């Protein structure tokens, strides 16, 4: 308010100074009317100077107190308005004075004419002053209004700034409150993080305590429930006893106590006897079940053994079938030309038909052997001479074992114990089981030995086949078979027959395999044209084929010598009673006659001459053909030619693991 008062006083002083100057100038004009223009100019200049001064003073005041104008209030505005109202009042007074002076001058015109002139000049001067004053007043009014307008704008800005300040202050207060709250929350969070392990430990302890309380409460509930059940059961029992006692008390037809006690004792004895019987029956059932389980186990073992035996037999059969197929293929590959010639010869009527089936070949090839019931004794005594005979005996022995097992199963089933004599029969069964187990062990050991021997023989057979050169058939003279081997074979055969008790009926258990006298091999000599045709050469052969013809003649000679030696050996060898040797001996002469006649018909008299030339070479001994065979092996073409009119196949049989060291490779040519 002090600044506003200062501004009011300054404005009043300015207006008062202006009014005083006007009065003084008017007085001066009255005093010096002659100098009107100069005074006017001077007054105007003074007034202009004063106005400039007033402006300067106002500017200085505004420059000095510019910061205080922003803080003017309504009271200062009211004071300024009052000053503006006072100014027209002063002007009206001046006008009245001017009018009064005019009136006074008009009254004194009559007296003083000079005075009239001065009044006229003064009135003009006053009118000019009045115009200048009005102009100044308008300028001042405009300046003041602009200044007031500025002041009002500044006041409005001040008010806006005050409002903004107030809003900012409130916002600051709210933000400070939020900051305090955030700080408090952050402090709590940090404290909670620091106190987390403690809180967790407290929580875990509380959980443990609660669980312990739960367990205790559950245990208490269980005990209470048990007690309740027990009490309920006791109550029911007591109720039942009460009802029974009430019934007894109500019954009037009761017997005496002695009779009742006697009846009770009898009933108790009967109950005890029944309990004992039940216990004894249970024991018997247990024993019977054990016996049955053991018997079932034994039978299952036997069945498993039989199944394994059948599987092994099936595998062996398949293996043998494969071997037979392979041998058939090899023979077909070797004897291509012989098959073609045989087809042509079978068509003729005079030629005796030859059946070259596998069964006939097996009968011809097989040497005498026996099929034994127990494999252990057979292996220790007899070593078979051929692979097929060995496998056939093994098959027969395994079949006999399977039949024995099938016979023993019903025998054991019939020996099941009854309820009366369970203990004694159980002991007998245990003994029988032990005996059967021993037999099974012996059979297993025998089978293992069989397998080992079979493997050894197979390895030896493979080695011997590998040692032999391909496409060469070695023929070893049968004189290498010593008489000792024949004696050993006879003794072993007799022992086996005595052990098995099969002397009376050998046809039932043993297969009648016989070694009859070997058939004579048919050897034919051909002309050069036919031999060349067999070899695939042209019929008209030159001197180059002479060596082959000589070679064929020599081989035919050796073969004829060998056949004669075989016939001699077969006459001196062992021949069983159930063989067919006598029939073959009777047919030898007729067969030779037929052969000679047939060859004459086919090839003419040249073949007979060649056979006559080759006959004296037989007396040279049995060693020459062996040496010639070893030094000159048969070529495959010559072998096929020699087999053309004989048997269709040449089979080579190696003895597997011979019984004596002198026994070597044995080959039978059919």
From Swiss-Prot:
GO terms for biological process: intraciliary transport. Residues 148-259, 305-336, 420-440 form a coiled coil. It holds the Pfam family Lebercilin. Residues 368-380, 546-558, 637-647 have a biased composition (Polar residues). Residues 560-572, 585-594, 621-632 have a biased composition (Basic and acidic residues). It comes from the Eukaryota. Disulfide bonds: none annotated. Residues 24-44, 351-402, 495-520, 533-594, 606-647 are annotated as: Disordered. GO terms for cellular component: axoneme. InterPro entries: Lebercilin-like, Lebercilin_dom. Keywords: Coiled coil. Belongs to the LCA5 family. This is Lebercilin-like protein. It comes from Papio anubis. The lineage of its organism: Eukaryota, Metazoa, Chordata, Craniata, Vertebrata.
């Amino acid at each position: 308010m002090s600044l506003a008062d200062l501004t009011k006083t300054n404005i009043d002083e300015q207006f008062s100074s202006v009014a005083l100057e006007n009065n003084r100038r008017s007085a001066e004009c009255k005093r010096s009317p002659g100098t009107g223009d100069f005074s006017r100019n001077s007054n105007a200049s003074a007034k202009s100077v004063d106005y400039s001064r007033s402006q300067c003073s106002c500017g200085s005041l505004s420059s000095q107190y510019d910061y205080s104008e922003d803080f003017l209030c309504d009271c200062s505005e009211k004071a300024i308005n009052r000053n503006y109202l006072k100014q027209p009042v002063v002007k009206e007074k001046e006008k009245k004075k001017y009018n009064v002076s005019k009136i006074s001058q008009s009254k004194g015109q009559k007296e003083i004419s000079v005075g009239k002139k001065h009044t006229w000049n003064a009135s003009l001067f006053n009118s000019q002053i009045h115009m200048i004053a009005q102009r100044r007043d308008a300028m001042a009014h405009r300046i003041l209004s602009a200044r007031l307008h500025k002041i009002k704008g500044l006041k409005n800005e001040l008010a806006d700034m005050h409002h903004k300040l107030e809003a900012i202050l409130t916002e600051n207060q709210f933000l400070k409150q939020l900051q305090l709250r955030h700080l408090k929350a952050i402090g709590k969070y940090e404290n909670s993080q620091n106190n987390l392990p403690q809180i967790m430990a407290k929580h875990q302890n509380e959980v443990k305590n609660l669980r312990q309380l739960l367990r205790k409460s559950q245990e208490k509930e269980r005990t209470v429930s048990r007690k309740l059940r027990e009490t309920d059961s006791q109550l029911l029992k007591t109720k039942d006893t009460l009802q029974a006692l009430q019934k007894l008390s109500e019954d009037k037809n009761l017997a005496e106590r002695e009779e009742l006690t006697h009846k009770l004792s009898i009933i108790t004895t009967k109950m005890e006897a029944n309990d004992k019987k039940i216990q004894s029956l249970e024991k018997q059932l247990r024993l019977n079940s054990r016996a049955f389980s053991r018997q079932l186990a034994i039978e299952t073992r036997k069945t498993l053994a039989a199944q394994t035996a059948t599987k092994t037999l099936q595998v062996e059969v398949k293996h043998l079938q494969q071997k037979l197929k392979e041998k058939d293929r090899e023979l077909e590959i070797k004897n291509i030309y012989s098959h073609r010639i045989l087809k042509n010869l079978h068509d003729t009527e005079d030629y005796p038909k030859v059946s070259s089936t596998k069964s006939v070949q097996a009968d011809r090839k097989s040497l005498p052997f026996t099929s034994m019931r127990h494999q252990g004794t057979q292996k220790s005594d007899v070593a078979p001479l051929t692979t097929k005979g060995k496998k056939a005996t093994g098959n027969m022995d395994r079949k006999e074992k399977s039949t024995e097992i099938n016979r023993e199963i019903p025998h054991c089933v019939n020996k099941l114990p009854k309820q009366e004599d369970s203990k004694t029969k159980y002991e007998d069964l245990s003994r029988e089981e032990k005996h059967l187990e021993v037999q099974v062990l012996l059979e297993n050991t025998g089978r293992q030995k069989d397998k080992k021997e079979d493997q050894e023989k197979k390895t030896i057979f493979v080695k011997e086949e590998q040692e032999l050169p391909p496409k060469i058939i070695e023929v070893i003279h049968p004189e290498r078979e010593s008489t000792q081997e024949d004696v050993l074979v006879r003794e072993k055969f007799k022992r086996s027959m005595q052990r098995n008790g099969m002397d009376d009926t050998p046809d039932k258990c043993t297969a009648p395999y016989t070694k009859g006298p070997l058939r004579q091999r048919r050897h034919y000599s051909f002309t050069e044209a036919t031999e060349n045709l067999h070899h695939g050469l042209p019929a008209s052969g030159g001197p180059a084929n002479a060596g082959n013809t000589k070679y064929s003649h020599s081989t035919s000679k050796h073969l004829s010598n060998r056949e004669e030696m075989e016939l001699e050996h077969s006459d001196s060898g062992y021949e069983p009673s159930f063989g067919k040797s006598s029939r073959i001996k009777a047919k030898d002469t007729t067969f030779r006659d037929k052969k000679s006649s047939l060859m004459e018909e086919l090839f003419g008299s040249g073949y007979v001459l060649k056979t006559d030339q080759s006959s004296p070479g037989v007396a040279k001994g049995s060693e020459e053909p062996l040496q010639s065979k070893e030094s000159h092996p048969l070529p495959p073409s010559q072998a096929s030619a020699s087999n053309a009119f004989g048997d269709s196949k040449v089979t080579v049989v190696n003895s597997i693991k011979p019984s004596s060291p002198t026994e070597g490779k044995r080959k039978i040519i059919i």
